[in-house]
Amino acid sequence: MRRAAMYEEGPPPSYESVVSAAPVAAALGSPFDAPLDPPFVPPRYLRPTGGRNSIRYSELAPLFDTTRVYLVDNKSTDVASLNYQNDHSNFLTTVIQNNDYSPGEASTQTINLDDRSHWGGDLKTILHTNMPNVNEFMFTNKFKARVMVSRLPTKDNQVELKYEWVEFTLPEGNYSETMTIDLMNNAIVEHYLKVGRQNGVLESDIGVKFDTRNFRLGFDPVTGLVMPGVYTNEAFHPDIILLPGCGVDFTHSRLSNLLGIRKRQPFQEGFRITYDDLEGGNIPALLDVDAYQASLKDDTEQGGGGAGGSNSSGSGAEENSNAAAAAMQPVEDMNDHAIRGDTFATRAEEKRAEAEAAAEAAAPAAQPEVEKPQKKPVIKPLTEDSKKRSYNLISNDSTFTQYRSWYLAYNYGDPQTGIRSWTLLCTPDVTCGSEQVYWSLPDMMQDPVTFRSTRQISNFPVVGAELLPVHSKSFYNDQAVYSQLIRQFTSLTHVFNRFPENQILARPPAPTITTVSENVPALTDHGTLPLRNSIGGVQRVTITDARRRTCPYVYKALGIVSPRVLSSRTF
């Protein structure tokens, strides 16, 4: 039995001194100073990543290699017995493929991974959805607006206006950005036809409109009017137009993402835009072109015609003189076009200069024409359209309408206190803001330390996350407005343009950059996840959205798990 080395009392010696003194003590033969052997380390700890990699299936010998586990959502053997009440986002599937087990028999089988090792699985998933961009499930088919619902006279010859918050619902479908805006406007008009028109509300009182134009183009700062007389029919960015007392509410709707209008603090509760918020965004009025052109007409048209007659006779005499000069041209051709030695001018050029000098000398003798007083043009705003719909001017002497535009308030209003201070103009997202989805494999993967084990679908531990495979696809169409006009006559989409005579209530133009929503299959590598050492023959796969709900729009869900040894089990 070897005794431990003995040292004198005091602090222990350093490691270097002990190692260097050991060979000397052994040479002297001291029984108490025997050489120190290195500590014994088991081979298992020398190779922590070796471990055991045996995989044992029921009734089969252990397999000393890795395998793969396939998670399929629509296996025919699982539908009738396991998934009759499930869907593609929450299903059960059998994972033992080496025997012809029925689903009932497979549920009693297990795949045992060597419990002397830590196991992990490389998880790869394939997810395909068929979700439309406007649907009730993702809160993209509804929005609220405050509109006028009653305009009734009172006993004292006044008008009582009544406003209410109304929820509008769009039909579900996969629409482009332009079509969605048309459907939102159509929902407001249909509510007016059903409620407002029956209670005395005028067509010019429709106080909520979604548009895409920049109503300030053509604005003259001197006159305060849009001088072309029409608003530029070009799409720039989705816009919200409101009349006094009106507003829109996107608190429980994601359609604001489609309009490209977001909050600067997106996690704050509520998203409501009212008329008072759009300070500085009043739409300028149009120039009354008919009145302007009528004021420029000259009443003395006949006098102008007489002057034109004298000009005509004068031109005839000039033609005769030109004909005589042309007859003499063959005779004087050489003389008139020859360059003299004392000047570079030809004889013809000198004659022309002499004629101009004579005309200038004779000009003072002519009687000066009497200048007629010019009429001052009439510049005034257009108050109504051809169908007598009012443009709602602020006052009779104002050049602005009561309509307020979010786009104008954002770009031309006060950036410190206006709508720009708490809203943000961003790129329109036709998907209305695609969310994330979570993968849960509660019977196969070990629960992460951030989750507790539960059997509720909404609280399953999350082992993987990815974005919902719905993307916004954009393409450029330079003839978008032309196509919109053609479709109005071929597809009879004039229902979206009920008030073509009114420049504000007219159908908004289609943007040249068209965006559509597209479902693209996604292949995601979730990395290596810790596996349980005992895997049941039937596994549950759950895919939940951001609100931890199963998603009915999942069309295909596949998962491939490749088990492998991570390390030896040390505890």
Curated annotation (Swiss-Prot):
InterPro entries in UniProt: Adeno_Penton_B
Motif segment (Cell attachment site): 340-342
Location (main, coarse): virion
GO function terms (MF aspect): structural molecule activity
Subcellular location as annotated: Virion; Host nucleus
Sequence ranges of Gly residues compositional bias: 302-311
Induction details: Expressed in the late phase of the viral replicative cycle.
Entry keywords, A to Z: Capsid protein, Clathrin-mediated endocytosis of virus by host, Host nucleus, Host-virus interaction, Late protein, T=25 icosahedral capsid protein, Viral attachment to host cell, Viral penetration into host cytoplasm, Virion, Virus endocytosis by host, Virus entry into host cell
Gene Ontology BP term (one): virion attachment to host cell
Low complexity bias: start-end ranges: 312-325, 356-368
Gene Ontology cellular-component terms listed: host cell nucleus; T=25 icosahedral viral capsid; viral capsid
Region of interest (Disordered), ranges: 297-325, 347-383
Assembly and binders: Interacts (via the cell attachment site RGD) with host heterodimer ITGAV-ITGB5; this interaction promotes virus internalization. Interacts with host WWP1 and WWP2. Interacts with the fiber protein (via N-terminal tail region). Interacts with the capsid vertex protein; this interaction binds the penton base to neighboring peripentonal hexons.
Family: Belongs to the adenoviridae penton family.
Domain comment as written in the entry: The cell attachment RGD motif is exposed at the virion surface and is involved in binding to the integrin heterodimer ITGAV-ITGB5.
Miscellaneous note of the record: All late proteins expressed from the major late promoter are produced by alternative splicing and alternative polyadenylation of the same gene giving rise to non-overlapping ORFs. A leader sequence is present in the N-terminus of all these mRNAs and is recognized by the viral shutoff protein to provide expression although conventional translation via ribosome scanning from the cap has been shut off in the host cell.
Role played: Major capsid protein that self-associates to form penton base pentamers, each in the shape of a pentagon, situated at the 12 vertices of the pseudo T=25 capsid. Involved in virus secondary attachment to host cell after initial attachment by the fiber protein. Binds host integrin heterodimer ITGAV-ITGB5 (alphaV-beta5) thereby triggering clathrin-mediated endocytosis of virions. Mediates initial virus attachment to CXADR-negative cells. Binding to integrins ITGAV-ITGB5 also seems to induce macropinocytosis uptake of the virus.
Protein name as catalogued: Penton protein
Natural source organism: Human adenovirus C serotype 5
